[in-house]
Every structure is written in C-alpha cells, then in structure tokens.
C-alpha cells in the first residue's frame, strides 16, 4: 500500500508507539485454537479504546478548520463520546455531546457511572435527546445552535465513522501487518462492527496488506442486511480518499447482538468473564463481549475459513462494565 497516500492527511499524534499484539496462551488452550489479541483497549487517553485512532485524523482536521468546539453524539455510555471529550480537553477545546438512552433504562448506574461519569470529569456539555433517529441531521442542528452562541464547532459523526476518521484503522492495519510479519500468519481477524469505521478501515488496509486473512465483523446493533451497506459505503469512501481499489468482500455475522444494541446478553457476558478469568483482560458488555462471543461460537461451529490463528481486535470499552453492574 502506498504509505504516502496516508501521510498527506493531517494527523495528531495521540497514541505514539504501536499498541501490543499479544498471544493468549490460556485462552488458546481453552478454545483449542491459537488466539491473538490487538490491544487497542490500552491506547493512552481516557482509559483507552479504538476511537483515538480516528480522532488523530478528525481532531487534526478540526484544528485545521479553526474550530474551538467538538460536537458529537452517542449513547449515554458511548466510548466514542468519552474519548472525544478527552481529546477536546487535551487540546483546550469545548466539547458538546448529544446523548440518547438507547435501552430506556432508569438504572442510576447506567445514567451516571462508567463513561457518563468520565464526561463530567472532562467538563463536557451534555445535551439529551429522545433518540438519535437521524444523527447527522441532529448534529448539524446542534452545531447551528452552538455556532449562534459564538463558538466555532466541528462535527464528528457517531463513532468517528466517516472516511477521514476511518483512516485511523487503515493505519492500524499497517501496524498489525508489521507486527505479524515473520511472527505469525493470521488466518482470520475478528472485530466488533457498529458505526462501521473501524471495520471498514481494517477492510481496506488488510485487503492490501494481508490479503490471505479473512476479516469478520460481528455486528453489535444491526442485521447483516442493515449493516452491510454501511460498511461497504465507508469501505469505498476510504478507498477513494486513498486512491486505492477496495474489492474485498465484507463478511458480517449478526447472530450475537440480540436482544439489541447496548443490552447485554448471556453469551457476551460469558465471554467477558472467560477472558477476565483466563487472561486478566477486560472486555465490555456492548461491543467486545458480543464480538468475542462470535469468535468463540465461530470456532465451535467451524465458521472460520480454516483452523489457523485468529486475531481479535480489542476496541476497548471496559469503563462500561461499571455502568452495567449488576449485570456483570
């Protein structure tokens, strides 16, 4: 892949060194398959997570445009909103977050703990809405109101998932390929697929760098029919930005997110407990727990293309564990 195509985009350096790519010996023994994990849960800011890779590009663009305010949206327990607020604090910017309660709970822990608690620490301005039914339009309307108050807002989409933000996961694919080179031939890569930027960025990068590896997105909020166009559209938009072709098939599994986004399920919580007990690594109930449930079931159901090593992309999210107590 021509690296110069990535380097022409302004980017802030938040992460520094590559995040670890580790072998999981006890988990591998338990599953009877070599399992590796990419530790994007340990990126440096605000208790870690994958969105920081996207924010390196998005925040750089905001500064280039002269913005003094970052505006974004998500669930009350959004990891993306938490990381955006932290970046705003680090850069001396105002942050306005449009939040919804997707599970309709009145549980105090969900409404005040976990990521929501951290938003207060980052001095985030919170705006609540009934539902993010049309988040792009709702964010633009909020930006207009904020601008009328004298601020210079920059809108970051839900999950940081546009073509610019997703470049962070093309960059991640480069990192993964370099870490695997001469060390391990990964057969399959598993990632949670939600707002689709992480999945689409990896799809573009891995197609060119590790073409023999299949990439599987485990959906956390939508059926394959609803999620596929989101990932494909972003995949093509990223490729256009980089002047590359992107023809890799997008593979999605939608068997593991029921009963819905943000609602824990038994398989996901078992996966959270299993990795904690075997490896001391924390997953979360919303994204990585469900994605790991897909990996575990995928092995038992022989859904992977072969029996080679599997890489799990750990996108973070552990702060939500505290909000979902006592489900945990």
Curated annotation (Swiss-Prot):
InterPro entries: ACCD_DCysDesulf, D-Cys_desShydrase, D_Cys_desulphydr_bac, TrpB-like_PALP, TrpB-like_PALP_sf. It catalyses: D-cysteine + H2O = hydrogen sulfide + pyruvate + NH4(+) + H(+). GO terms for molecular function: D-cysteine desulfhydrase activity. The modification N6-(pyridoxal phosphate)lysine is found at residue 51. Keywords: Lyase, Pyridoxal phosphate. Homodimer. NCBIfam families: ACC_deam_rel, PRK03910.1-1, PRK03910.1-3, PRK03910.1-5. Its EC number is 4.4.1.15. It holds the Pfam family PALP. This is D-cysteine desulfhydrase. Belongs to the ACC deaminase/D-cysteine desulfhydrase family. Catalyzes the alpha,beta-elimination reaction of D-cysteine and of several D-cysteine derivatives. It could be a defense mechanism against D-cysteine. The gene is dcyD. It comes from the Bacteria. The keyword Signal does not apply. GO terms for biological process: D-amino acid metabolic process. Its cofactor is pyridoxal 5'-phosphate.
